Amino acid sequence: MMMHELPVPIHQSPGSENHSNPASREQSKPKKETERRLPSGAKVDFGNGSGSKKQQSNQKPKKGSDSEKKKANRANSPALPNGEKPNFYNDNKEKNKKLLDPSLPNGAKPNFSFYSESNSNSNSNVSSNSNKTKKKVHEQSLPSGEKPVFHDKPNKKTSSSNRPDKNGKKGPVEETYAGSSFHSSPAALNLPKPSFQRTSPKQQANTINDENSSPSSSASSVSMSSPRPVAGAVAAPPRYPVTAYPPGSIPGAVPNVPAGYYPPQYAQPQYIQPGFTYNVNPQGYIQYQYPPFHHPLAPAQIPYQQHPFPVNAQPPAHVGSAPQGQKISFDDLLGSAKK
């Protein structure tokens, strides 16, 4: 029988299992752990056994000297590789304040204070000498010794102009803007002012007479007496154009030809239309007679005169060729097509 065909008991009582398997009882009993030792003979201690706990309980804390405590603190406290202690700024608040105060590399404290304005409500007990020394300390200066201007104080001129008078009225306010210095200059004030009012022809005549009578308008009278161009006259073209191009650069432009020079003109030959006289080959192709080719710039030649063949004459026969077909006119050809 095979192993998978062996009968397996299904119903078994719990008591029968204990009696049948004595090895299970031995497994249920706790076994004593065998002591494991190192090759040197020392016991192996992993720190998780009962023996280690007993040893820890047996060890009582001993009161050591101050030097031992310091050594323990040194061992627990962090230290840099060179032996110095790192400063985390968490010891005391007073120490932190001292350390957080800004200082220059030479140890001096920087002065971030601005101009000290004069205190109108200063105490009477403070002497004038002490106030002067304070102002000197707070005043800033450039390396050249000059005082910087931050434009954070009102100017004396503007403050004096804005102060109200005894009657409670403020003084004139001067407006400053870009170009105000030129607009207030006498050269700008003496410029003629334009008038946009519509004037009648009588007023225009009066103004013209006043200008002519005044000595200052002598230049204007001279300009008026000078001849003026008539409105209907055609203006002459400009002698020199605005854009000067080199000759020959503009296509279609007439080149600069001296006066009295005319290029030679050749007589162009007249091309005579071949007409409707033609010859018919034995193969049935029609041959037209064309005039010879003429160059347009060639010298004048005698025009080509076409000599049509007579109707009754026969074309010259070629030696050794088949006889040609009958010569017909264009009218006969059209008549045959209509039929």
UniProtKB/Swiss-Prot annotation:
InterPro entries: PNRC-like_rgn (IPR028322). It is found in: Cytoplasm. It comes from the Eukaryota. Residues 13-25, 196-212 have a biased composition (Polar residues). One of its GO terms (biological process) is mRNA processing. Keywords: Cytoplasm, mRNA processing, Nonsense-mediated mRNA decay, RNA-binding. The keyword Transport does not apply. GO terms for molecular function: RNA binding. Its main location: cytoplasm. GO terms for cellular component: cytoplasm. Residues 111-131, 213-237 have a biased composition (Low complexity). The keyword Transferase does not apply. Residues 26-38, 91-100, 163-173 have a biased composition (Basic and acidic residues). Residues 1-240, 309-339 are annotated as: Disordered. Pfam families: PNRC (PF15365). mRNA-binding protein which stimulates mRNA decapping. Belongs to the EDC family. This is Enhancer of mRNA-decapping protein 1. It comes from Scheffersomyces stipitis (strain ATCC 58785 / CBS 6054 / NBRC 10063 / NRRL Y-11545).
